């Protein structure tokens, strides 16, 4: 199923974590309940909405949070701008994410730079989500689905009219973590050309949980007698390493010639600091540049679209303000500097050919070129970290060549179908590596360097969808998809099992464990069956109910295993965490998403009142071991009441999450208790301004985030100095305010 969310152009990029209309719940549930797009691309039926979503729903720092309340989607919490979306229990590289058509890759051994982190929420105009049954035309090399994020489309003036000038500015403040930010957008256009600038900056301190979850005291104490090298004080409810600072800028230029549009988009990102509460390292710098040239044209035979893009990331990690920096008995080892350089380039061409009034044929080709260098400079005088530079990945290569064809048929007013096939070839390789020194790392490096590192996967995707609309009050959809994903660079090429310290640094999961890759990994293949039923009143204004059950079998699912299972010897640990590798297994996931809305009353002097709700359930199992899959969101539900009167919008929202008892034993995943949260939002909108107010977690409830991972926000995180057993808590009460001005 595909949902699309459009955001009104109020630049305030959202000030409140979910904000007004029941936060993203209302915005996102409306993607199904109120503004449903068909599964079939290019066929769109939009029902009447009870409200129009706006950027005030958005959490300014984290674009992924725009999806946090969408049925079937949850989030792996990471840094303040770097959450990872999860679709039906599958996350990270198992989801294809495109930002303005660019197919981006995270260049980090901890995946601190996911694709959604490269666009600020204030620059997002709409998001499309394809869950499970994904048309081959919207992406391959993924098994969970596709997320398409787009900035605003160009606006041109009418011929003969004056220049069209728009400007917007917003600011916000969140009390819990002292988060503050500002964003700006301005554009100018005539009937042939346009130019737009967007910029934003956000900064926040550590957030506070709804209660104490650890002792108060110094964040980290070094082994020497020099107390000036200790880390500062953290309160018992302060979540260490949850601070962040981010700056984003973008320029867009476009030329419109009759039925042809040529656009150039440039993006810059600067993150000088971002703590990671569930990783042993923190981001100390992230510089990214994006170049994106696209063409779209309409012809007598159909549409043609083409794109060429390039993205470069320079990423640095070190121990941040809340983690021990000075190591060694005399406190002379200055942390563990880590650097990454990633380059992603791509070319896409797609043609939509109108074969007849009934039939559309989509054909296309894609090429993606990815290069990665991941190296750790020596940190003397530590014997284990000198004298050489440690090469974690040297000239990592991942090239993908795809072609696809897709046939969409509108048989009559009731029946639609879609059939698609995609062929994908993924070629990977990496250069020779070395450790800090030969004595401690030479053996593992030699084994890797003598291995055949050139890998080629020939993958096939297929999709079959059908939609039946017997009348205006009901729609039924069903489909099957076979999707494949090749391993990423770190899953295949992370080589070092020499000691716990270096294994700790390769962790894509936030569980605190150490990992080493596996050159023998195969591509994952997922088989998904899904159906959707949607019932509503005939005029699609009073009520809607949508239910989507699904089941997915994954052959060669990449999961954590004991090192010995894949012939590797890894150090034992005494801190409660484990050192692991990866291997292909068989997995099964199944669940159901339910969402709905009802207009309780409308019109008159009391305005309108609506009720909105959603329920999500997913279960994941490793069929080879009988173990549960990692980081599966427990049963959860959201309910909201929204009142509108004139310019006022007022919402009260409740979120309920069941306890997480189905956890993965292999990773020593921690259980979490169930909880309920209450949020209140209010806004007033004038013609050129909007004021937003909100209180989130009204009762300051303490809870553990089910997908938050292990708490590693403070202490000596390099090795075994932090003990296993503490989960990352959710944020406590926060009072939020924001103001938007537009011209």
Where is each model-derived feature located?
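Acidic, small-polar-rich N-terminal luminal/periplasmic segments of exported/outer-membrane proteins
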Residues: 36-160
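Outer-membrane beta-barrel translocator/receptor signature
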Residues: 122-125, 131, 136-222, 244-247
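Transmembrane beta-barrel wall of Gram-negative outer-membrane proteins
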Residues: 175-204, 214-272, 287-301, 354-361, ...
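C-terminal beta-signal and adjacent terminal beta-strands/loops
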Residues: 210, 484-485, 560, 611, ...
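Flexible loop and strand-edge segments within Gram-negative outer membrane beta-barrel domains
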Residues: 242-246, 259-304, 312-344, 378, ...
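Surface-exposed extracellular loop regions of Gram-negative outer-membrane beta-barrel proteins
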Residues: 270-272, 312-316, 371-373, 378, ...
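Outer-membrane beta-barrel signature, preferentially recognizing the C-terminal barrel domain
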Residues: 281-299, 339-344, 392-400, 448-469, ...
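Gram-negative outer-membrane beta-barrel transporters
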Residues: 357, 410-417, 426, 542-562, ...
């Amino acid at each position: 199923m595909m949902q699309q969310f459009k955001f009104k152009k109020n630049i305030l990029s959202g000030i409140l974590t979910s904000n007004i209309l029941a936060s993203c719940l209302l915005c996102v549930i409306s993607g199904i309940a109120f503004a449903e797009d068909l599964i079939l691309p290019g066929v769109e039926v939009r029902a009447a909405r009870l409200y129009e979503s706006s950027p005030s729903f958005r959490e300014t720092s984290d674009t992924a949070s725009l999806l946090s309340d969408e049925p079937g989607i949850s989030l792996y919490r990471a840094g303040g701008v770097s959450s990872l979306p999860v679709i039906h229990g599958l996350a990270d590289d198992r989801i294809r994410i495109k930002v303005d058509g660019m197919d981006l890759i995270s260049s980090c051994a901890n995946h601190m730079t996911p694709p959604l982190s490269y666009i600020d929420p204030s620059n997002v105009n709409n998001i499309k989500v394809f869950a499970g049954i994904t048309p081959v035309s919207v992406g391959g090399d993924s098994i969970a689905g596709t997320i398409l994020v787009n900035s605003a489309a160009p606006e041109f003036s009418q011929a003969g009219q004056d220049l069209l000038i728009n400007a917007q500015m917003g600011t916000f403040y969140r009390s819990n973590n002292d988060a503050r930010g500002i964003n700006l957008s301005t554009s100018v256009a005539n009937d042939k050309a346009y130019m737009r600038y967007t910029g934003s900056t956000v900064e926040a301190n550590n957030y506070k949980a709804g209660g104490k979850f650890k002792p108060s005291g110094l964040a980290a104490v070094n082994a020497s007698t020099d107390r000036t090298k200790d880390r500062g004080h953290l309160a018992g409810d302060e979540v260490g390493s949850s601070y962040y600072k981010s700056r984003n800028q973008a320029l867009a230029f476009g030329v419109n010639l009759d039925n042809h549009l040529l656009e150039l988009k440039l993006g810059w990102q600067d993150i000088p600091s971002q703590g990671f509460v569930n990783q042993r390292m923190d981001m100390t710098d992230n510089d990214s540049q994006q170049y994106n040239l696209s063409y779209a044209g309409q012809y007598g035979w159909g549409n043609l679209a083409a794109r060429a893009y390039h993205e470069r990331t320079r990423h640095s990690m070190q121990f941040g303000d809340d983690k021990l920096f000075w190591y060694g008995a005399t406190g002379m080892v200055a942390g563990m500097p880590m650097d990454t350089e990633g380059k992603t380039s791509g070319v896409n061409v797609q043609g939509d050919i109108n074969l007849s009034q009934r039939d559309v044929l989509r054909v296309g080709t894609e090429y993606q070129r990815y290069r990665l260098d991941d190296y750790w400079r020596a940190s003397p005088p530590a014997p284990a970290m000198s004298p050489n530079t440690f090469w974690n990945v040297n000239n990592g290569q991942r090239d993908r060549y795809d072609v696809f064809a897709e046939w969409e048929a509108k048989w009559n007013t009731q029946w639609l179908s879609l059939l698609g096939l995609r062929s994908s070839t993924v070629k990977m390789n990496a250069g020779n590596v070395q450790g800090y020194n030969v004595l401690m790392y030479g053996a593992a490096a030699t084994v890797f360097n003598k291995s055949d590192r050139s890998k080629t996967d020939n993958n096939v995707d297929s999709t079959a969808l059908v939609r039946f609309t017997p009348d205006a009050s009901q729609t039924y959809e069903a489909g099957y998809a076979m999707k494949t994903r090749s391993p990423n660079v770190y899953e295949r090429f992370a080589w070092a099992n020499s000691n716990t310290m270096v294994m700790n640094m390769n962790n894509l999961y936030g569980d605190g464990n150490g990992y080493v890759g596996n050159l023998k990994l195969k591509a994952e293949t997922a088989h998904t069956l899904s159906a959707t039923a949607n019932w509503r009143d005939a005029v699609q204004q009073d009520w809607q109910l949508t239910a989507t059950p699904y089941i997915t079998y994954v052959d060669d699912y990449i999961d954590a295993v004991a090192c010995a299972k894949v012939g590797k010897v890894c150090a034992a640990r005494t801190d409660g965490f484990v050192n692991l590798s990866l291997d292909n297994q068989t997995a099964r996931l199944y669940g159901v998403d339910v969402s709905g809305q009802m207009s309780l009353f409308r019109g008159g002097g009391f305005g309108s009142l609506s009720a909105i709700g959603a329920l999500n359930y997913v279960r994941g199992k490793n069929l080879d071991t009988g173990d549960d899959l990692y980081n599966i969101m427990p049963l959860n539900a959201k309910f909201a009441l929204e009142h509108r009167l004139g310019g006022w919008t007022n919402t009260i929202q409740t979120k309920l999450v069941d306890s997480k008892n189905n956890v993965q034993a292999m990773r020593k995943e921690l259980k979490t208790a169930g909880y309920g949260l209450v949020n209140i939002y209010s806004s007033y909108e004038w013609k050129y301004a909007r004021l937003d107010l909100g209180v989130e977690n009204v009762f300051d409830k303490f809870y553990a985030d089910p997908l938050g991972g292990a708490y590693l926000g403070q202490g000596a995180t390099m090795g075994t100095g932090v003990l296993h057993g503490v989960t990352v808590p959710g944020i406590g009460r926060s009072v939020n305010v924001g103001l938007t001005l537009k011209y």
